[in-house]
C-alpha cells in the first residue's frame, strides 16, 4: 500500500494529518482570529479529541503535527496549508496573513514522514486547501476568492498539468465579507465519487454545470441550517464512500444525506467548528485515500 496519495475526496481514508487543539488554541485571541463568542479553548480541545477518536475508529492512521503553543491557532485546520497527490505534497500559500507560517509546519512534517514535496505555491500566489476539490483523479477544481487567487491557481496548474491533471478555477462570491471566509468547500462536500452535498445558491454556475455533466448527483443541504451555521452544516468528512463524520445539531442536512444512502456519525463541535468557522473536513488533511 502506498504511503501517500489522495486525488479523491471520498475514497477510503487510510492516513491523515491532524494537529491537536490542546496547545495550539490554548491562548488564542478570539478577536484576532475572528472566532465567535462560543469559542472556549478547553472545550475546543476536547471536541477535537472526540473527532480524532471517530477518525481513528474508522481505521485511518493519524499523523500528528507537533502540538505546541506557537501562536498558530488556526493550524488545527490542517486541510488548508497543503494538498496531497499521488506524486507527493503540494505546499500551498495562505490567503489569511495570520496563517502564513503554517505551510512550513506541513513541509517539516512531510519531510519527517518521508513524503516527497512535489512543489510549492509561492507569493504573491495564494491557494488554500479548502478551495480545492478533486472532481475526479484527473480534475482539480479551485475556488478563486478571498483566499485563493489566479496567480496561485496558475502555479498549481503548472505543477499538475505535466502529471495529466487538469486544473480549473471558479469564481466565488464575497458572501459575508473578507474576514468570514468562503472556500469552495464551504458549498460542496463530496460524499462518494458520484455524490456530493451542496448548497447550490452559492455554487459557481460553471462548476455546477461540470458536476452535472459528469453525472455527479447533488444532495441539497438545508438552507436554514446552512445560514444558521455559517455553512458548517455542509462541512462533512467522508471516511469512506457514503460514510461521513458531521457536526451535530443539523438534523435536516443529516436526514438528506441519509436519504441518499449515507451513514452519518456526528460529534459536538460548538466551541470548535461553529465558533472557529471550520468543520471536520477543515480539521483533516488526507495523506492517503484509496
Regions found by a protein language model. Name each.
Residues 1-290:
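The feature marks the mature, well-folded catalytic cores of soluble enzymes
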